[in-house]
Each structure stands twice: as structure tokens, then as C-alpha cells.
């Protein structure tokens, strides 16, 4: 493809993306892809093309094969999982990132990549109201960030002996403590870090689905009394099921007393902390050792962009650094080499989409969208609370409303089947998308508000769809 051909194709694709977003906003597509497993695979050639193809053929397949197999996360009626927004400014930042072909092996391989990431992560720190004691780096996802945090916790608890001799070299097993509502990625991170399920403690939650600090204290003390070593506590700030907020201040106090690392998983809720009125929800976060939040969810940078912050970057670098001779530079003592801040050696220029987004939206623009979604969630909460045959099963802390339709006098198992059916009927209709989930043994329906284009009319629409599906 020549530069001129690229220019023509690029203009065409920018128009295509802009048109797609307009069509999504007009609700031209069913929110959930209407396809069956294997349908796209069967429609595509089983072998790669041997000769170059015209760009028009690629465009045709994009329209006729790829797009029909997409679930439309940008649709204003998408209320499943959590938001995965990619604002236009971030899309353009991603385009420039790929177009520049930068590779962040070390500072020298791309000074712009390294230093823009430093600046953007410090901007986010300020937007979150965090102190200057925090230093940040972009990871691909919160799963990776949590894994890095638990490896750092393991090395601090073992005085770096685990790196030399492995966990089997430890006389006392190292224990990790998580909420029973913690994301599955926390368990996976602990397993990959070598802890094993026998060395994980699932701490019970209260009526609001937040970790019970007293139960954590009891578990820490019991393990210590039996010769085990508390290593890490993972507090959840905005759980996946209900956006429950663990009491970070009390958890931090317990972790500090036990000598355990405290990692805060704020993958979703962290975005909300750019509005000051949300910050009481993570009171005590300054006492944590590390925290993560995902701008690629609610804020709109697009995947993959996970902001990981630590209070002791020297410890992080000691744990993660290998520093072979071929990666050293003449400026080694003057610069940050982000390869030593995580797993990846080769790093994409992710900060560009952050930079584009913050410039194009401004802090006030991003805050306004968060506040809009919070207001929509409170509106839906009020509707559910006023309906005699519906109940909320969790507090509405942020933008997620968890509901359940009631069938008085019916067997609980039948009510579970009924609520699962409601979610399935809404999703199959194409008029909205919600997530069925199980909370403490009961089937419920999650309505997660936060797509960029979602306005009050779309929240009213999903509420009407839920009521209609309940009557079906």
C-alpha cells in the first residue's frame, strides 16, 4: 500500500467508523450480535489469500461478515458487564500510536513514549485526588496489574527470597486475603504468582456485599497464630457484581498491623473518583501499597489501558527488573524504563490515547459524563424502589443497578429461573443488553450504565424492557 493508497483508505475508514457510531447512536443494530457459534468462522476462507486483494474487498467483508458478528458495546442501550468506551479522540490517539510504530523497550527506544506516559499518569493521579507519593505506569489490563501487585507482595513478605528459591523455600506459607466478591482475575493472579488456592482466604461480605473488616482481622490473626504468614490483602473498590465498596480504611489498618501488602482493585470505580463527591467511597486509599483502575472502562480510552499506581516504585523495579546488557542505555540513572515496571518488555504507545482524550475532553468534560451516568443510575434506582413487584439487591454506589423481579409465594428456584428468563428475553429482543448474575445464591439482573451515548431515554427504555419481559 503506497502512501497515497493509505491516505484514501484511511479517509474511507475514518468515515466508516464515524458512520458506524452514528448508526449505533440511532439504534440501527440489535445490541447483541445475532449470530451462532462458528458462523463467522464458517463464512471466512479456510486458507489465507495468496495474492493481494483490493481494499474494497476488505471493506465488503467488514460490512457483510465482521460487523454482523459484533455485539455493540458503544450502543447507548448497552448495559451489560461494565462500559468499554472508546471516545473518538482516543480512537485517533490509537491510530497515531500504530502509525508511528513506536516500541517502548527502554527510554532510548522511544523517549516520547516513556515521558508522555509519565506525564499522563501524573495527570490521572491529580484527577483522582491522590497524593504525590504515588507513581504510575500503564498496564494492559487490571488482571496484569493485580498479578504484578501480588508478585511485589510476595517478594516483600519473603524479603526477596521467593525470587531466588521459589515459594517452596519459605518456612511459613504466604497467605492472600480477598473479598468473596473479588473479581476472578484476583484468584488467577494469586495462582500465577504461586500462592495456590490453599493459601487464599475468601473473606465474607456484609449486607452491602463489602468485605467485613472484622472477619478479615479474625482471619489474619488465626493464620498468624497457626504459623502462617499474611502476605497480601486485595480490597475491592467497585465489585463486578454490584460495585460494592470494601471499607479500605479499616482494611488498611488490619493489613498494616499484620505486615501484609494492601492492593486496591478499583478497576471500575477508580474512574468515578475524578469527581470529588465519589472519593469518600475509597476513603483510606492513601494507606494502600498499590492500586489499579481502568480508564478503558468508564472514561473511554479504549482497550487496553489500565493505570497501575505504587507508593514504592523502587521495590517494584527491584522485583521486575532483569536489565540485560543489550537494553541498557547511557541514561540509565536519569530515566524511567517502564519495562521494569511490569511484565512486558515491548510496550505500545498507549499514553497517546490518554493524551488525546484528556486534551479533547478536559477534566470538566470527563467529570460531566461521570455525573450524568450517576444521575441516570439514581433515576433507575428510584423507579425500582417505587415498583411493588421489583426489588434492588444491592446499594447503588455508582452506575450499576442490581434488580430482581418478585413472584410472591413462588418457589425460590422458580423465581431464579424467571429472572434469568427476563434477562435473556431482553437481550434476545435486541432493544437492550443486560447481564444476568448470581448474588449470594440468588439470580439477579445487572443494569450497568455508562456507554458514552447513553442518555435518560435509554435508561427509561431498558426499564420498560425489563418490565415487559417480566410480564411475558
Language model features: what each stretch is:
Residues 1-133, 424-428, 432, 450-452, ...:
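N-terminal entrance/gating region of PLP-dependent enzymes' catalytic architecture
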Residues 3, 44, 100-108, 130-137, ...:
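Glycine- and acidic
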Residues 88-171, 177-179, 185-186:
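Well-ordered mid-protein domain cores that form the structural environment of catalytic cofactors
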Residues 141, 145-317:
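Conserved PLP-enzyme active-site core in the AAT-like
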Residues 231, 239, 258, 283-388:
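Active-site C-terminal subdomain of aminotransferase-like
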Residues 391-426:
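Conserved PLP-binding catalytic core of the aspartate aminotransferase-like
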Residues 395, 400, 428-446:
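Conserved PLP cofactor-binding pocket of PLP-dependent enzymes
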Residues 439-472:
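PLP-dependent enzyme catalytic core of the Aspartate aminotransferase-like
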